[in-house]
From Swiss-Prot:
Protein name from the UniProt record: UPF0301 protein PM1869
Pfam families: DUF179
Family: Belongs to the UPF0301 (AlgH) family.
InterPro entries for this protein: AlgH-like (IPR003774)
Signal sequence region: none
GO cellular component terms, semicolon-separated: cytosol
Highest taxon above the source species: Bacteria
Amino acid sequence: MMELQDHFLIAMPQMEDDYFAHSVVYICEHNDQGTMGLVLNQPTDLSIAELCAKMNFMMKTDRTYGNDLVLAGGPVNIERGFILHTKTAQTFKHSYKVTDQLSLTTSADIIDTFGTAQAPEKYLVALGCASWTVNQLESEIANNDWLVVPANNRILFDVPYEDRWLEANLLLGIQHHNFAHQAGHC
């Protein structure tokens, strides 16, 4: 089985699926039950500050929120929030350790830390996720739908949303204009 956890999936330019065209997906979990990830470059119109206000967390004083947008993390469980974040001293109710430095949290207790010193140093918030059944993603990779590259935190948290696809390709040393529109197999 391929090891895909903590990797980026980079949609090939010829990807025909409207949802995933030109997308970068961070793989949070990959095991013998399937694969789950978050699309990193499809921001919604909702800011994290607005999300906190809707959840009544902004009623607390002394909080500052950045202007980051909530991501459309994928077409599955679109009403559910997923927070990918750097390691914190605090533990949260529903967290999954992705790497030694990154966790995925789905419980609202993490949102209560936003705007405080207890918040993770870096985080992104997504509504929905992408998921694949066992061997489905490996089949899509074999069909040249995706490129795979080890993830890095700069692209995860610091690169503007609209530049993430190009930046992820650069991790492989590929300029987008060098892509062939067909792939061949020997």
